[in-house]
Each structure stands twice: as structure tokens, then as C-alpha cells.
């Protein structure tokens, strides 16, 4: 199943605007659920989340990770896995929608391993997890319906998303999302 096939099917099943899903996935991962070079799932390891889960963990590659290329993300993730695999998985956003692993219960999984297993298997499950995440947050769904890009960005990426974008020299998330939505809705 292609990304577009999964989006088309699941946007209808979950009553989510198809153009919004396409825009969201484009902004999050450029439409890539798997690294074309390695075939591994796209990840973003979050050291701050791992530190919350493992406050006494010794520093290492995991603690130095920023927003990096996939090779560096996987090195940091694998380093954290040596300390606590489940905590590392919960501290990492995965797949097309970059849903954080710690949301596994919210998505209906018994543990984080089940969430990762399905996301690593195929694109369909990555889009499914994103749809499950979106539809289990009423405030987020209301913001999507209103096309309230600032609120969507604040809920999904945190209230400091604009400051982070400025620090990284990137376009703010709300602006990127709005532009991508306009592109996909025409």
C-alpha cells in the first residue's frame, strides 16, 4: 500500500480531512516513513524525554542528540537502548506522523514494542497511528476543523515551536503546515 492509498482510506475511516493528513505528513517527514538509504523507519530520538524516563542514566551519544540526520538519530537511539530499550522507544517519535512512543497506550497498544512493531512493518500502520493520535485529542481535532494552524502546532510540537524554529533557522511549523495544506487542498 502506498502512502496516498493509506491516507485516502484512513482519512475516510477516521473522518479527517485528506488534504490535512497529506500536509501533516509532508511537514513531519517529507512523506517518508522509511529511510530510503537504510529501509529503517524514520525516527527522531528526543534526549529530553529519555532524561525524564531515565534521570540517572550516564551521558552518552544519546544525550548529545539534536535534530539530526537518520544515521545520528539511530546512533543516539541505539545508545539509549543499551540503558533501557523501552524508555528509548518511548522517547522517540516514529514514522510518517512522528508520533512519540510514549503514546502507545493512547493508541491502544499493550506496550511500546507493539506500537513500534506495527509502525516498522508498513506505511498503513504509520498512517493509522497518526489518525488514532489525532482523533483521540478533541482539542486537536477542533483546531484541525477550524484550520487553526497555531493551535495545531502548539499541541503537536509544544508551545515553544516558533522559538525552536527560529533557533534552527526554519520556517515555523504553523506556517509550513498552512502552506502544505493549501498545496494539497487544490
Annotate each PLM feature.
Residues 1-81:
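Export/targeting segments at the very N-terminus of extracytoplasmic proteins
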Residues 2-6, 12, 59-186:
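Non-catalytic cell-wall polysaccharide-engagement segments
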Amino acid at each position: 500500500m502506498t502512502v496516498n492509498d493509506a491516507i485516502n482510506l484512513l482519512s475516510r475511516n477516521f473522518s479527517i480531512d485528506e488534504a490535512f493528513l497529506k500536509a501533516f505528513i509532508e511537514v513531519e517527514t517529507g512523506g517518508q516513513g522509511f529511510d530510503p538509504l537504510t529501509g529503517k523507519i524514520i525516527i527522531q530520538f528526543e534526549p529530553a524525554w529519555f532524561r525524564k524516563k531515565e534521570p540517572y542514566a550516564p551521558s552518552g551519544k544519546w544525550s548529545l542528540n539534536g535534530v539530526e540526520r537518520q544515521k545520528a538519530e539511530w546512533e543516539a537511539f541505539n545508545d539509549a537502548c543499551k540503558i533501557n530499550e523501552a524508555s528509548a522507544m518511548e522517547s522517540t517519535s516514529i514514522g510518517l506522523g512522528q508520533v512519540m512512543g510514549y503514546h502507545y497506550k493512547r493508541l491502544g497498544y499493550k506496550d511500546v514494542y507493539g506500537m513500534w512493531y506495527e509502525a516498522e512493518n508498513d506505511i498503513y500502520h504509520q498512517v493509522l497511528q497518526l489518525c488514532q493520535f489525532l482523533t483521540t485529542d478533541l482539542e486537536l481535532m477542533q483546531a484541525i476543523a477550524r484550520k487553526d494552524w497555531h493551535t495545531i502546532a502548539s499541541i503537536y510540537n509544544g508551545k515553544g515551536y516558533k522559538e525552536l524554529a527560529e533557533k534552527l533557522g526554519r520556517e515555523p511549523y504553523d506556517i509550513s503546515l498552512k502552506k502544505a495544506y493549501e498545496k494539497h487542498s487544490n
